[in-house]
């Protein structure tokens, strides 16, 4: 992961706000929570986490310092769960102090994702 200010020098972490400002257009990211949520945390690992096991409720080896990337598989399974279950899963992720959530493939996040992440802001 590199900072927008020093593209040739690797950094150990990057603020979510800086990540969004630096790479949002290039990655075609769209903010679905309020701007205040960008100030909430820092991305501390260079890799992303596909939270496939977390969406089932298994958090034993959850990589909470990484961007949480929900792809088509995670979102399909997640949407099959009840709204209450989805809320619990996202609340558990937030309690583990994740830096941010990215939903790929132009998929929409669930209302529970948006609500819980906004409240954690």
Across the structure, where does each feature detected by a protein language model lie?
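Gly/Thr-rich phosphate-binding loop signature of adenosyl cofactor/nucleotide-binding cores
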Residues: 2-94
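Residue-level recognition of alpha-helix initiation/capping sites
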Residues: 84, 106-108
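Short acidic/polar active-site loop segments enriched in Thr and Asp
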Residues: 99
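Short, glycine/polar-rich helix-capping loops at beta-to-alpha or helix-loop-helix junctions
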Residues: 108-115
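Long, charge-dense
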Residues: 120-121
């Amino acid at each position: 992961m590199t900072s927008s200010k020093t593209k040739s020098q690797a950094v150990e972490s990057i603020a979510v706000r800086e990540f969004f400002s630096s790479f949002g257009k290039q990655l075609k990211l769209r903010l679905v929570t309020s701007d205040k949520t960008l100030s909430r945390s820092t991305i501390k690992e260079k890799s992303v986490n596909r939270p496939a096991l977390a969406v089932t409720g298994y958090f034993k080896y959850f990589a909470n310092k990484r961007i949480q990337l929900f792809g088509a598989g995670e979102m399909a399974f997640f949407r099959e769960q009840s709204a209450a279950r989805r809320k619990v899963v996202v609340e558990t992720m937030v309690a583990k102090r994740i830096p941010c959530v990215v939903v790929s493939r132009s998929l929409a996040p669930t209302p529970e994702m948006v609500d819980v992440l906004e409240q954690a802001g």
